[in-house]
Amino acid sequence: MSDAPLCAEGLECIRGDRLLFSGLNLTLSPGQLLQVEGANGAGKTSLLRVLAGLSRPAEGEVRWRGLDIQHHRASYFTEMVYMGHAPGLKAELSPLENLRVSVALRGRMADEARIDDALARVGLRGFEDVPARGLSAGQKQRTALCRLLLDPVPLWILDEPFTALDVRGIALVRELLEFHLANGGMALMTSHHALDVRGDCRSLNLS
């Protein structure tokens, strides 16, 4: 058995009647980033959802610290953050309110100063109280990125985190990833952008 905190063995995923991948093995250790690559429809998002415990594989298992995540979901979810394609914001709530809800759903106390600092860090100072429906796609994505700053967990699973971001936003994501890895964090991600992140970065191609 691998000593890596995250270990997947013999994963098989089927969508409809189509086999996306089978016999897939991977590990992820502190300070490592794994970029999942492949053509559209290759199963990148499906793999990330399996690794995040949001979908079950047809075969195989995912273990976190030696325990099957499907049988220990609650403890796994306290150590992992998943960011999907959509920012996951409530349209009628402001960035500030959305982040308060996000922190509360994670079972943590909302620290107003930390939320304010996170919004400033991602360039949303002055937009704290604007309903999400009035934000641009890039501003919504920046709001979602605040969750990485507010929830200090070891594992990030990010599906296309650069979506809708401008050059500064992309640079910010890279900066966050580099800091996370340098401090012993781990990351799994998909992206159509060149990664260009300093650290122990690897790739897995599903095509």
From Swiss-Prot:
It holds the Pfam family ABC_tran. One of its GO terms (molecular function) is ATP binding. ATP binds at residues 38-45. It catalyses: heme b(in) + ATP + H2O = heme b(out) + ADP + phosphate + H(+). Keywords: ATP-binding, Cell inner membrane, Cell membrane, Cytochrome c-type biogenesis, Membrane, Nucleotide-binding, Translocase, Transport. Signal peptide: none annotated. One of its GO terms (cellular component) is plasma membrane. Gene3D superfamilies: P-loop containing nucleotide triphosphate hydrolases (3.40.50.300). PROSITE patterns: ABC_TRANSPORTER_2, CCMA. Its main location: membrane. One of its GO terms (biological process) is cytochrome complex assembly. The complex is composed of two ATP-binding proteins (CcmA) and two transmembrane proteins (CcmB). This is Cytochrome c biogenesis ATP-binding export protein CcmA. It comes from Methylococcus capsulatus (strain ATCC 33009 / NCIMB 11132 / Bath).
